């Protein structure tokens, strides 16, 4: 083999090596790209920076779905807007009993609560009778309260949302992840909602006995999470839902998770999203806008 052949062979090998390197790098980048998005199991979801409104992740975010007890955040806002005394007492009556799904409640008819206690039980423990009593005692009654809920939704730009009652027991209370993110951002501006929704537990007297209620979102009891506001929900047709605003790497983030199938799926999704934001997508949170 002459020296020209040796040079040609060497050049060919070098070119082949470089080409393989480029292909390998491209494959690595493609693989990394596939890992950029979190593996969210909920059927619909949205992640948004609460301070800027920037959407960081979405999955079927414009799909209109039943929202179950997420409804109670809107109920809380309109009742608080009415500026009724939180120390005034209200009573659970037969009108607050669930006739639609016959769901159970530990709040017996005749139980007397302060409005503050009713708010806490409705938001923290998703107590349907408490939410019903709050709206029933709204100025003008339930019908006026539902009308206020829909006006509030319209004012917030929730163009694909509809409310028909206070608790979320009706599948006709519907919204999208995009609209619910707007609602969570709005609700976070109410100090009482932030406080009531994130309490770990509350003991109230029902009849002659104290009754302990716990938060339906287990993450509020996890010291690793800094949660500003939260609400869970469940209906057979809505699946398991979770909305919350939390702080991740120093930035406020709204998470909306809808139509999860498993009991712990929505909580697992929240953890996956958080890890993704902390590791794979830090630039999206560190950017100042």
Feature annotation, model-predicted:
Residues 11-23:
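Bacterial N-terminal signal peptides
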Residues 30-178, 182-191, 248:
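Active-site-adjacent loops and short helices of periplasmic peptidoglycan-processing enzymes
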Residues 23-30:
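Sec/Tat signal peptide C-region and signal peptidase I cleavage site
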Residues 2-14:
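Bacterial N-terminal signal peptides that target proteins for export
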Residues 31-42, 115-116, 140-289:
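Penicillin-recognizing serine hydrolase domain
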